[in-house]
Amino acid sequence: MNNKNIEIVTDSAAETIELGERIGTSLKGGEVFALIGNLGTGKTHLIKGISLGLGAHDPDQVSSPTFVLVNEYFGREGLIHIYHIDAYRIDSVGEFEALGFEEYCRPDSVVLVEWADKVLPVLDGVECIQLQLEHVSETQRKIVVQNAPAYLTVS
């Protein structure tokens, strides 16, 4: 991992999805992403793009698992498991650990955690690629990538 911050501004939801797709295409498996941002900043759009880049068959099925907490998608001919975790409704770090977070972190999976700021103590022990999303305007989003591996494609 490197500690360089990379800033990208997207001008629409479609561009945010395209950015996610570029990121997903470059992944090898074993990555954990911590997505942080307020409501409506594009976390789920970015995850939809990452899933598409990983070869998910139906990216339209990608939705925020706010009530079920974890969605699983399959990419690259079933070889990559994509775990989409939404920590928005999680009340404690213990509840997050009880989801089996560590079991999802495998070489054949990519783990994407929305609202990761709520569970940072658990993520501190894991090498995470952090994606911080912010509103710039009604349509623009600033995405700051931290701790990205050298092979990660963001531009």
Where are these regions (language model features)?
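Hydrophobic anchor at the beta1->P-loop junction of P-loop NTPases
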Residues: F33-L35
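Conserved lysine of the Walker
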Residues: K43
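The conserved Walker
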Residues: L39
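Switch I (G2) and immediately adjacent beta-strands of P-loop GTPase domains
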Residues: F67-D91
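N-terminal pre-Walker A segment at the start of P-loop NTPase domains
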Residues: N2-G20
